[in-house]
Design a protein with these regions (language model features):
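Alpha-helix-loop-beta-strand connector modules within alpha/beta enzyme cores
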Residues: 44-60, 83, 88-100, 128-152, ...
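Glycine-rich phosphate-binding active-site loops on the catalytic face of alpha/beta enzymes
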Residues: 76-87, 115-130, 152-186
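Histidine/lysine/aspartate-rich catalytic loop segments that bind and position anionic ligands
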Residues: 93-122
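Short, acidic/polar
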Residues: 11-24, 63-66, 99-105, 154-159
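N-terminal active-site wall of soluble small-molecule enzyme domains
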Residues: 27-89
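Structural motif
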Residues: 25-26, 71, 109, 142, ...
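Conserved, mostly hydrophobic/aromatic
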Residues: 31, 68, 106, 114, ...
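Hydrophobic faces of well-ordered beta-strands that scaffold small-molecule active sites
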Residues: 6-12, 29-33, 59-61, 76-78, ...
Length: 186
């Protein structure tokens, strides 16, 4: 399990989901905080953001501009359902997409990077479709923007990521299920 990429995106839903001290200092790591259920204390988030800055990690907040400004995050993550067009051009934006239409929407929104979802098959009951390596590589040839694979990435198929023509990778459920994977990857 040795993957060489320029950028690694890790999704967390709580600041306790990941132990930053287990991961080497690196400017390659982007942490995306997307808490849908409970509101976390802003002071706690600010301290977490400072710890990220000390370790050289970029800290992005999902879909919440006020929270981004309150904890002084590095940028904003726009989910695929977020259709707002008018955003501040000075904010670093990362978008999420599942199809061509959503990729084009994220480009119009000004996203510098797009996380394209479901590279591999997932266990979700209502989400059966996925791109696969060949289709994903064909899709990213059509765009000049940085497109990163997300979805279905597990410890068992990490080596296949070396075949993806992308500058990075994104992990969501694998960091929750197996937190030690983050320290092994980097």
């Amino acid at each position: 399990m040795f993957i060489i990429k320029k950028k690694y995106y890790l999704y967390i839903e709580n600041t306790s989901d990941i132990n930053l001290k287990c991961i080497k200092k690196s400017k390659k790591i982007f942490i995306i905080y997307r808490n849908k259920s409970i509101k976390e204390n802003i002071d706690k988030l600010y301290k977490f953001r400072k710890l990220c800055a000390e370790r050289g990690f970029k800290f992005y907040i999902a879909n919440d501009l006020r929270l981004l400004k309150a904890c002084k995050g590095d940028g904003l993550y726009l989910s695929s359902f977020n259709k707002k067009i008018s955003l501040d051009k000075r904010i670093n934006l990362i978008g999420s997409a599942h199809c061509f239409k959503e990729i084009n929407e994220k480009i119009k929104q000004g996203c510098k990077t797009i996380l394209l979802s479901r590279l591999f098959k997932t266990d979700y009951a209502n989400k059966k479709d996925f791109f696969g390596l060949i289709k994903f590589n064909l899709i990213i040839k059509n765009y000049k923007i940085s497109i990163i694979p997300l979805g279905g990435i597990r410890a068992s198929n990490l080596n296949k990521l070396n075949l993806v023509n992308s500058s990075g990778l994104a992990l969501l459920s694998e960091t929750k299920k197996k937190p030690a994977i983050a320290s092994r990857l980097f």
